[in-house]
Amino acid sequence: MWEPYMPVEPGLGREENFLSLEDLLMSQEKLPCCIESGFPRLGFLDKGGDSDSIPEGSKMELPLWLAKGLYDNKRRVLSVELPKIYREGWRTVFSADANVVDLHKMGPHYYGFGSQLLNFDSPENPEIAKTILQTFVGRFRRIMDSSQNAYNEDTSGLVARLDELERSLFRAGQRGLNAFQSWERGKAAQITASNLVQNYKKRKFNEADA
């Protein structure tokens, strides 16, 4: 099938891939911040203010890419407040049963955005990282089982609740199932490795060369 652009995989962990459309969209998501040092002549960033500067102590939401660019742990230019889905209350919900949460409604880039939060110095970072990993592990099996066992069924209800990373995994699982079904019917000459496996091998090869 023809695609309007060549898909590029999102970055891994705290690294972003600015050739990835998904990472670009994620970097536009807003992050609640508190200004620790006044910003002269940047009042236009605060749509609710009427000053040409942003005074110290102001609270505002900044795009992730801008918050990362301004953040400096030594100078304390700004501090970051955790979005509610990454706070302790929601971490408790995820640890109880991550499958009940509508991740797309809470944050379409839950895993990627949460990984980016680790760039900011927070005492809760270890717990955030732990919850993100446990959530992924807890939901992964159900997602892949559904992608393999819902052949020709309506999966829109399930997919609507998935984070963007989970949606890509679900689609990869269905593509693999379709390829296997075609192979069984003799419509494919051979089974090839999935794009995820091929990209992983390329990354490992490049790391070995480096």
Swiss-Prot record:
Disulfide bonding pattern of the chain: none
Any GO BP annotation: DNA replication
Highest taxon of the lineage: Eukaryota
SUPFAM superfamilies per UniProt: GINS helical bundle-like, PriA/YqbF domain
Assembly and oligomerization: Component of the GINS complex which is a heterotetramer of gins1/psf1, gins2/psf2, gins3/psf3 and gins4/sld5. Component of the CMG helicase complex, composed of the mcm2-7 complex, the GINS complex and cdc45.
Function: Required for correct functioning of the GINS complex, a complex that plays an essential role in the initiation of DNA replication, and progression of DNA replication forks. GINS complex is a core component of CDC45-MCM-GINS (CMG) helicase, the molecular machine that unwinds template DNA during replication, and around which the replisome is built.
Protein name: DNA replication complex GINS protein PSF3
Originating organism: Xenopus laevis (African clawed frog)
Species classification: Eukaryota, Metazoa, Chordata, Craniata, Vertebrata
